[in-house]
Structure formats: structure tokens, C-alpha cells
UniProtKB/Swiss-Prot annotation:
Catalytic activity: 1,6-anhydro-N-acetyl-beta-muramate + ATP + H2O = N-acetyl-D-muramate 6-phosphate + ADP + H(+)
Keyword flag ATP-binding: yes
Transmembrane segments: none
EC number: 2.7.1.170
Entry's family note: Belongs to the anhydro-N-acetylmuramic acid kinase family.
PANTHER family: ANHYDRO-N-ACETYLMURAMIC ACID KINASE
Protein name according to UniProt: Anhydro-N-acetylmuramic acid kinase
GO BP, sorted A to Z: 1,6-anhydro-N-acetyl-beta-muramic acid catabolic process; amino sugar metabolic process; peptidoglycan turnover
Amino acid sequence: MSTKELYIGVMSGTSMDGVDCALVEFDQEQVRLIAHSDYPMPADLRQQLLSVCTGQATNLKQIGELDHRLGHLFADAVMDLLSQAGVDASQICAIGNHGQTVFHQPNGEFPFTTQLGDANIIATRTNIDTVADFRRKDMALGGQGAPLVPAFHQSVFALQDSTTVVLNIGGIANISVLHPTRPVLGYDTGPGNMLMDAWCETHTQQNYDKDARFALQGEVNEALLNSLLQEPYLHQDAPKSTGRELFNMEWLTAKLQGQNYRSEDVQRTLCEYTALTISKEVERFRYGPTPQLLVCGGGARNPLLMQRLQQQLSHWQVSTTDAKGVSGDYMEAMAFAWLAYRHMHRLPSNLPEVTGASRLASLGVLYPKA
């Protein structure tokens, strides 16, 4: 009797550059990517979301309307993937939808996280059971609600005799540390593409620095770099998580202190900042004869960033997750398909040693299709 099941993972990250969808086959715990798609996010929707995420004035009406629009956008993305793959909705066990994070505050007296994208709309329009709201159960148990992907990394990358670190460079950079003899660790190291993208968009009207062309025109400004490295978040102990609430243009403007830096030098310095904040954390976990760093996410396509990581981590084998047979572009979407699979089978999917939660739990809330 076949145990193969199909799930769809839907991810819209902090970069807000579109919706990633992954059609994933599970055979027990074996994972295979069947099909994938990128679905564009309308420019006006992205701008509204960015304004909300960066603390500009909003109201409940706008939040409610964004929740509704995103629900339809995610449903459209799923139906587009099914059409491309030639798969009927009836063949899908469930959708795992992350939603669009607009605020994440894991610390303080009233910890909370907010993801938009009405899963009721997704379930009813696609006619597929939908699992969403993955982070708040972990937070209710005292955890950070993030990162959630290390549990998936643990399931797909076999342990070696040396440390394997899986690095996802999205808007924020986060690592999963797979040590041969210790529990899995995972946390956000700091900014990934977020600051580079924001600065590039401000000064070149491009959403991101393609092939690092803008950064390669500049030089690292050591004084600015040292100022950026003073950020207190970098010196906090794990478990920890961060986002656009901290690392945004307002934060960067304050660090610039009105100095008249060349824009290309700032871009180059931001790239160096991302590389250094990552490599410093990765190097802490070097163990064994052949430690490896596996990179995924949009930052893996930044040649300057990858070059600097290789240079700063000379004792590590640095490659992309694609070299290990797991798509780097769709890693997070695959992870949320996996989280939905775990939910539907009532299996735990958080790692308390990673998030700080008091116990294991099956994450997510089911929104039935009927």
C-alpha cells in the first residue's frame, strides 16, 4: 500500500518579492520536490505591506483588507502551481501556509507575532484543507516562534562526522546547526538581504542588487562597518529571532548619522556586514575534519556575498543546498509543506532547544476546506 502523500507549502518572506509555492511528495519521512512556482506580488500590495512592517501609521481597516487580499493572493498562487503541474486539488492532502509576517515581537511582557493572509479564503477557494498560524503555539509555550525551519533541516540532511550548518539568506539570515553529537541549534544571525535590498531600492530603484553590481562599484567603509557591528542584537545569546521591526531603513539611517557616504560604499559595506555577522556565528560551531556550510535563499545568488563567506570561512566547505539535492530557492516553502504534513499526522514539529519553548508541540491550525 502506497504511503505517498502530496502537500503544498506557501511562503512569502520578509523580502516580500513574491510568493514561493512548492508541491512536495512525502513517503513516510522521505521528501521530494515535485513542482514549484514563483507568483508575483502586486507592487501596490508590497508597498502597503512594507509601510506597515516599518511602523508607518496604519489602522484595523487596512490590516483587515491586507489580510483579505493576501488570502486571495496565496489562493491564486496555489491554483497557478496546480495548473502548471497538471495536478488536481483533490490529490493534495493539505496546504501549509506561512502567511506574511508584518510584526514579530517574541520578547517583552506581551510576546506576539502577526502573519496576514486569511487561511479561510485559501481553503475555500482552493478546496484544499489549509494549515496556517504555525508560530503562535510555540510562543504560547514560551518559545520565540522562530526559527521553525531547523526541524525540517534536521529531517532532510543526514548527520555527518562534522558540523553541517544550513544557512538561509532571505531578508533575515538564519542558521540551523546540525552537530554530530549535540542537539540541533537554530537562530537568526541578523540581516540577510534586507538592508542591502532597501538601500539598493532607495538609490537605484531596483528591488535588489542583481549580481552585486552596485556593491562591486564601492568599497567597505570600516568606520561604518564598525558602527553597524555594535548592534546589541548581535551579542544576545540564542534562542533569538529578529526581523524588519529592527533591521530597517530607519535603523540604518540612524547608524549613518548624517555622514555623506558614497551610496555604493554603503552597499558594499552592508554586504560585508551581512557576511561578517553570518560567518562569526557559523565559525563558533566548527567541529570535525570537514565542516560544511549549505546556503539557500535569495542571498545564495549574490556572488559577492558568497565569495566573502567562502573567504571568511576558509576551514569550511561552502556550497548551496542544491548541491545536496534540496532546492535552495524553495527550501522554506518545502519546510511549510513539511510542517503541514506533521500537523495532519499529529506529529511534533518544533524544536524546544531551538525556539526556547517548554515542550514539543504539533504546530499550526487547520482550516478545513468544507
